[in-house]
């Protein structure tokens, strides 16, 4: 079972000295938007006694923040352990957004082929956001109302370039430590230029698996028709176990 402390996230990978550790980071899917016993990290640990998986996430903040959040746990990974970045199709819109849920957040920019992390806005408005219910609710409502969902072709391509460059840099760092990094893509069926994205990942020698077709069937979705239900979590758990098994055999 995953033993991460849900409140403080301080306990990770206990009792796994003889097992290969699998750290999974991502958005709300990785947070486990389902009954605890149906989370796919729990399912992985039930499917195989060779692995100890723990899934973490920070929904809505984009892949860059998912990686940054995971950094504090990377130190628990050893040689030949596995790091998985679970990337949803809507994560690419989160890359360059400056706010989420009425909160200012770090965001990535691409200027002159140089990727930069811009810090969050530290204005008094956002400082008092968490100290006033009315202000917090108002900012969250306005953020949801004004949230951008339609992006130009250039914006989509820019987000893909930022994603690939940021991930490439971090994955190369993990490889230098003999940690196995891989991306699991999903919910990309309606994402423009997804074929171009896959070609970019291939060109940068980034290992990835696209689960979009596999998980598109609604029988794998929960009542919100977005997150995975018990069957969906079990499906991806089996895919992860099979991938790691095959990767280690080769």
Predicted regions and their residues:
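A conserved hydrophobic secondary-structure block that centers on an alpha-helix together
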Residues: 53-63
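Conserved, well-ordered alpha-helix/loop/beta-strand core segments that scaffold catalytic motifs
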Residues: 81-93, 141-215
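Membrane/wall-proximal cationic-aromatic binding patches
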Residues: 1-47, 215-219
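Histidine-centered active-site loop/cap adjacent to the catalytic His
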Residues: 224-250
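Interaction-surface signature
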Residues: 63-155
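Second-shell loop/turn segments in exported
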Residues: 28-31, 55-56, 156-157, 222-226
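Conserved beta-strand elements of the Class I
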Residues: 23-25, 54, 82-83
């Amino acid at each position: 079972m995953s033993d991460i402390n849900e409140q403080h996230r301080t306990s990770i990978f206990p009792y796994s000295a003889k097992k290969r550790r699998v750290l999974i980071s991502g958005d709300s899917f990785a947070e486990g938007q389902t009954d605890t016993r149906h989370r796919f990290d729990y399912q992985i640990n039930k499917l195989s006694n060779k692995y100890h998986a723990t899934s973490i996430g920070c929904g809505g903040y984009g892949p860059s923040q998912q990686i940054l959040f995971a950094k504090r746990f990377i130190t628990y990974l050893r040689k030949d352990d596995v790091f998985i970045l679970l990337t949803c199709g809507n994560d690419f819109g989160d890359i360059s957004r400056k706010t989420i849920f009425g909160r200012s957040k770090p965001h990535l920019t691409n200027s002159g082929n140089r990727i930069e992390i811009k810090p969050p806005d530290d204005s008094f408005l956002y400082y008092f956001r968490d100290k006033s219910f009315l202000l917090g609710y108002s900012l969250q409502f306005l953020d949801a109302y004004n949230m951008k969902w339609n992006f130009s072709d250039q914006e989509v391509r820019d987000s893909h370039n930022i994603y690939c460059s940021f991930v490439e840099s971090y994955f190369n760092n993990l490889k230098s430590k003999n940690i196995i990094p891989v991306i699991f893509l999903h919910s990309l069926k309606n994402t423009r230029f997804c074929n171009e994205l896959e070609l970019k990942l291939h060109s940068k020698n980034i290992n990835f698996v696209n689960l979009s077709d596999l998980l598109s069937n609604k029988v794998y979705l929960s009542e919100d028709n977005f997150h995975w239900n018990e069957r969906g979590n079990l499906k991806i758990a089996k895919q992860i176990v099979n991938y790691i098994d095959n990767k280690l055999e080769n």
